[in-house]
Amino acid sequence: MRNLILTAMLAMASLFGMAAQADDYTAGKEYVELSSPVPVSQPGKIEVVELFWYGCPHCYAFEPTIVPWSEKLPADVHFVRLPALFGGIWNVHGQMFLTLESMGVEHDVHNAVFEAIHKEHKKLATPEEMADFLAGKGVDKEKFLSTYNSFAIKGQMEKAKKLAMAYQVTGVPTMVVNGKYRFDIGSAGGPEETLKLADYLIEKERAAAKK
């Protein structure tokens, strides 16, 4: 009986703690509620988008936190990486990511690209430089180059630009939940806090869908 009471008390304490944490999140402070929600790519699922740039040190530092979190998301949540395209080298790296994603190998080399830029100080600033580096990681060089320069990738680049504009993104890493809520490490208070906020907003959307 004592164990049951203790379990119940712990459960209630946990619930009160979650409620208190939820009360601490304020639209306009930790996150922004977009005035015009952006349609998600998979209707019926809660979409979580991470906007990033391979050259961003904060994005690189965020990887050890967000990767394990994203791999444990429940089936009703769809996680999407989206390159932020602010021109210049941002677009070059963004086109590389979209090419790798189209080839189905982004998961195999995503971390390697980050490390090449931030640890090995490679620029990866041209298609040829990227292709040579990626070939050493098992990516078909000719296929990469042909895909990189394809009309399909150019179309995906335009789509990514429009999404970033719709999300009103000004920096990275930035996260958007279900096309409605935008926030970043600065507004949330750190990497771990960013994912706690993401969890809260995911649950908020899940609860709203049940009403």
From Swiss-Prot:
User: Which protein family is named in the record?
Assistant: Belongs to the thioredoxin family. DsbA subfamily.
Subcellular localization, as worded in the UniProt entry: Periplasm
Q: Which UniProt keywords apply?
A: Disulfide bond, Periplasm, Redox-active center, Signal
In its UniProt entry, the species of origin is given as Pseudomonas aeruginosa (strain ATCC 15692 / DSM 22644 / CIP 104116 / JCM 14847 / LMG 12228 / 1C / PRS 101 / PAO1)
User: What PANTHER family is this protein classified in?
Assistant: THIOL:DISULFIDE INTERCHANGE PROTEIN DSBA
Q: Which PROSITE patterns match?
A: THIOREDOXIN_1, THIOREDOXIN_2
* One GO-annotated biological process of the protein: cellular response to antibiotic
Domain Thioredoxin per the UniProt entry, residue ranges: 23-203
Q: Which is one Pfam family of this protein?
A: DSBA
Q: Which InterPro entries match?
A: DSBA-like_thioredoxin_dom, DsbA/DsbL, Thiol_disulfide_DsbA, Thioredoxin-like_sf, Thioredoxin_CS, Thioredoxin_domain
Q: Does the keyword RNA-binding apply?
A: no
Leader sequence segment: 1-22
Cysteine disulfide links: C56-C59
- Any one cellular component term from GO for this entry? outer membrane-bounded periplasmic space
Query: A GO molecular-function term, please?
Result: protein disulfide isomerase activity
Protein purpose? Involved in disulfide-bond formation. Acts by transferring its disulfide bond to other proteins.
Keyword Thylakoid listed? The answer is no
The name this protein carries in UniProt is Thiol:disulfide interchange protein DsbA
